[in-house]
């Protein structure tokens, strides 16, 4: 079997049928669908069982609620495919996507991770954004992370993985923003229990994952603890990158601007944490790394320059004030 499609299911009775139909209508059919019902109390269990009776490629696991990571890990343990992909039960994939991405993997059999485009649909309105890629092969995790700005789309879905990658790597149970805490290990940016994987990573412009913003979902209702997971995951990745770059002038110059953009992303999460709690984080590593980078290259990103001028605490207060004034308009 070529592909295992793992779909965690939890209280998505209104969208689950369209999700499954978008897969079952694909021209490529060498796959299994593993539906992991994570203790849903709506009609999802019935829907899962009905699809399983209609098509023997659909397998169902009913379990007690353990969260998204636990559901994915459960599916991985049951997967039989050479490759694994994840689809959320409130999303769909475009017609022809599976045949296109599998054809790409057959053409480049050394590929361990293939990332393909995403159509991001915001709410129920017509607003859409296409996350697209060029045909590029990466054998360096830092290049992939910074040049593709992966930190902005650390999605478990919209990727095809060799199943072997998950022999020693799993999703962290009980934590939201779990993708940010997992993707860096899968791409070899961070060591998992002391060992790095060294995958061949490819991006492609074929196929399309259709993501729908869920107003009741984790991202839309993130708590301080959730955002801290995001901050912590990105901070670990930044520290790993800075450790690998060290004082190598060529690498500092190569990654100068892309590092600043990544640091700005982390700083924005820090500012959000302050807005939620009114508390400053104790000696955030990103502040130190901005200062260190500024000794070697010119800081070009405005927010980082402002950070160096007025300091972290003042920037937190200023950001909160600006947001308060903006919301009054």
Model-predicted regions and their roles:
Residues 142-224:
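Conserved nucleotide-sugar donor-binding catalytic segment
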Residues 63-79:
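Glycine-rich, basic loop-to-helix element that forms the pyrophosphate-binding segment
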Residues 271-329:
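Membrane-interface aromatic/basic loop that binds lipid-linked glycans or pyrophosphate carriers
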Residues 43, 91-104:
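Acidic donor-binding/catalytic loop of UDP-sugar-dependent glycosyltransferases
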Residues 98-129:
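Conserved donor NDP-sugar-binding/catalytic core segment of glycosyltransferases
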Residues 22, 37-46, 64:
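A conserved acidic beta->alpha catalytic loop
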Residues 84:
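Short aromatic/hydrophobic "clamp" motif used to bind/position activated sugar donors
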Residues 21-30:
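Short, acidic, metal-binding catalytic loop of nucleotide-sugar glycosyltransferases
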């Amino acid at each position: 079997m070529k592909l295992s499609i793992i779909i965690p299911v939890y209280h998505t009775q209104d969208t689950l049928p369209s999700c499954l139909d978008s897969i079952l209508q694909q021209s490529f059919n060498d796959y299994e669908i593993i539906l992991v019902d994570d203790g849903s109390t709506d009609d999802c269990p019935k829907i899962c069982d009905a699809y399983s009776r209609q098509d023997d490629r659909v397998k169902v696991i009913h379990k007690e609620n353990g969260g998204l990571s636990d559901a994915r890990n459960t599916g991985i343990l049951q997967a039989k495919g050479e490759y694994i992909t994840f689809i959320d039960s409130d999303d769909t994939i475009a017609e022809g996507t599976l045949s296109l991405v599998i054809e790409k993997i057959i053409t480049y059999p050394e590929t361990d991770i293939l990332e393909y485009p995403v159509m991001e649909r915001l709410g129920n309105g017509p607003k859409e954004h296409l996350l697209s890629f060029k045909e590029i092969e990466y054998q360096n995790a830092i290049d992939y992370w910074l040049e593709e700005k992966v930190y902005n789309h650390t999605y478990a879905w919209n990727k095809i993985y060799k199943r072997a990658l998950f022999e020693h790597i799993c999703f962290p149970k009980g934590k939201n923003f779990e993708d940010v805490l997992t993707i860096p290990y899968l791409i070899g940016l961070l060591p998992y229990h002391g060992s790095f994987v060294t995958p061949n990573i490819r991006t492609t412009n074929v196929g399309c994952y259709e993501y729908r913003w869920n107003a009741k979902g984790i991202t839309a209702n993130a708590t301080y603890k959730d955002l801290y997971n995001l901050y912590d995951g990105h901070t670990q990745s930044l520290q790993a990158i800075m450790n690998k770059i060290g004082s190598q002038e060529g690498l500092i110059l190569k990654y100068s601007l892309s590092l600043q953009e990544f640091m700005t992303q982390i700083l924005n999460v820090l500012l959000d944490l302050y807005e939620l709690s009114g508390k400053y984080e104790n000696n955030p590593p990103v502040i130190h790394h901005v200062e260190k980078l500024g000794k070697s290259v010119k800081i070009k990103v405005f927010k980082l320059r402002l950070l160096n001028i007025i300091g972290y605490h003042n920037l937190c207060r200023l950001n909160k004030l600006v947001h308060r004034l903006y919301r009054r308009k």
